[in-house]
Amino acid sequence: MSQQLIGSEYTVYRSGDGNGGFTPTTVKVPTLGPHDILVCITHSGVCHTDITFCQMGAPIALGHEGVGIVEAVGSLVTQFNVGDRAGGGFHRDACGHCKYCLSGRDIYCYNRVIFGEGDFDNGTFGKYYIGKETYLHKIPEGLASEHAAPLQCAGATVYAALKATVTPEKRVGILGIGGLGHLAIQYANKMGADVVIYSTSTSKEAEARQLGAKEFHLLDNMFDDVKAPIDVLVICGTKYPDWDRVMTKEFLARVGVIVPLAAPVHGPLSLPAGAMFFQGYHVFSSLVGSRNVHDEMLEFSARHGIKPMVQIFKHDGAKTIREVFELVKMNKMRYRAVLEMGD
C-alpha cells in the first residue's frame, strides 16, 4: 500500500445527527490489515435502509451498495489486484468456522459484521471503502458499475430468496414493482418461472411485461381473475395484502411459499394459522445472500443481461444525498438511485 494513502482524509456521511438526518464527517485511510482491500468508490446505490438508519439515530457511516476500483491491497490478499473492479458493502465479515459459515450460510454467522451491526466508520457514500478480501466481489465483464452497485444489496436480497424458492415450473407472484420488484421479475423470469405481477398502477404494465412478466393484475382486483394458483408470493411492496384472501388454495397453491422482502419490518406478520396448517404454507425470509450466492448472483445477472433500472446522480456531497433521500421517501425513484462519484 502506498504510504501516501495512509492517513489521507476523506468524507463519510454519518447518520445520528439527532434530527433523522446525517452529518459529513472527516476520517482517515487506515493502515490495511493483511486481508483488507481499499476500494476507491465510483458508484454507490442508495437503499431505503440508509434512510432507516438515519431515522433510528445510530451513528453509522452510510452506504452499503458500493462498486469501485481496487486501489490498494493487504499483504496476504490473493484474489484481487490493484485496478480490479470490486463490489460490496452490506456483509462485511464472519468467523469462517461456525456451522453457518461452513455450510455456505455465513450471512447468519453469530459473529457476522453487516451494515448497521458493526464497522460503523466505513460506508460507500464516501471516496473509499475498506473491505475484507472474502467479502468483496469481483464485478463480471459486461456488467456496468452503475448497474452493479444496487445489486450489492437489492440484487443479492432478491436473488437469494428466489434461488431458495423458485424452480422452472413455478408460478411466481410478485407484489409491488419497485426497487426490489423490478429485479424480482427479471430473476424469476430467467429462472424459468411464470411471473404474475400485482401492482397499484396500470402505468407499469408495459414495463413489467417487458421485464418478463406473463400476467399483470391490479392490487384492487388481484383475487378476481385467478387463472391458476401461484406457488410463490414475493412481497416487494410496503404493505401486506389481505392474508385471509391470499391464503386460500384457489389463490396460493398448497405448500405455497410467502417471501416477505420489503414489507413493514417493524410490525407483526399475522397469518391465519388454520390455512398455514391445512394447506402446508411456508414463510421464507431472506437477508441478502451469503458469499457464494452473492457471486453467483453477479454472474447470473451478467449472463442473462439482468440489470436494475437506475437514476444516476452526480455525487456533490451532502446536498446530493439529501436530494436522493427525499425522492426515495416520496416514492419518486424509478427504481434505484445511484451516486456517481467525481474524480
List PLM regions with ranges:
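Glycine-rich beta-strand-centered segment in the early N-terminal region that forms part
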Residues: 28-44, 53-99, 140-143
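NAD(P)H dinucleotide-binding glycine-rich loop of Rossmann-like/cofactor-binding domains
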Residues: 94-175
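Mid-domain Rossmann-like dinucleotide-binding core that forms the NAD(H)/NADP(H) cofactor-binding site
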Residues: 141-221
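Glycine-rich cofactor phosphate-binding loops and adjacent beta1-alpha1 units
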Residues: 164-171, 194-196, 205-284, 322, ...
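Residues in the short beta-alpha loop(s) of Rossmann-like NAD(P)-binding domains
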Residues: 201, 264, 289
